[in-house]
Amino acid sequence: ADAFLDTDPQERERGITIFSKQARLTWKNRAVTLLDTPGHVDFSGETERTLPVLDAAILVVSGTDGVQSHTRTLWRLLRRNHVPTFLFLNKTDLPGVNRAARMQELRSLLSPECADFSGMDWMEQAAAESEAALESFLSAGTIPPEEVRRLIAEEKRFPCLFGAALRLDGVEKLLNTLALYAPVKPAGDAFGARVYKISRDAQGARLTWLRVT
C-alpha cells in the first residue's frame, strides 16, 4: 500500500504494476528519469510503448524463479528496439538461490554476453572486445568508463547485478553501476519529440507524455 509509483487503485488491489509511471532522481550528480513499466504479460503493450524512448533498461529477474517465458519475450522486445540492458537478479537473499547457476541460465537463455558486474572479473573478458579496452586493461588493470558504455550501447555486454530490492540489498550497487556505465542517446540536430503515453489527470484533462529528442 506504500508503493511510490503503483498509485492506481487497481494496482494497489492486485499488487502489480499496470500503468507505466515516471519518477526522477539524482544519483552521483547524474539526473535520472525512471520509467516503471508492468512486468506482467497481460500488460506488455504498456511496456512495449516505452521502449523507443529509453536510454537503457533494467530487466528485473526473480532469483527464485529465474528466466520465464515472459522474461524471454521482454528480452526479444529490448533487442528488437536495441535498448542497452542491465539485469537485476532480485530476491537473491532467499534460500536455495544459486547465483552461479542463475548467471549460467542468463547466458544460455538470453545472451552469452550477460556479465556478472558484482565483482571485477568481467573486465578481463570485456577487454578482448576492442584494442583500446585491451590496451587500457593491460596497462592500468581497468577499462575507461566511456569504453564500457560503448560496449553496453552496442549490446556487446549486458551487466548483471544481484540483490534483494525489498531490503534495499544491492540497490546502491545497481545505481552506482547505472550512473557510471549507462549510455545516453545523443540528441538530434533538430528538435523532435516522441510520445509514449496518453493519460488523464484527476479532472479528466488529457496528458501527453513524451521524450524530447
Question: Which residues does each predicted region cover?
Answer:
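Structural and coupling elements of P-loop NTPases
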Residues: A1-T213
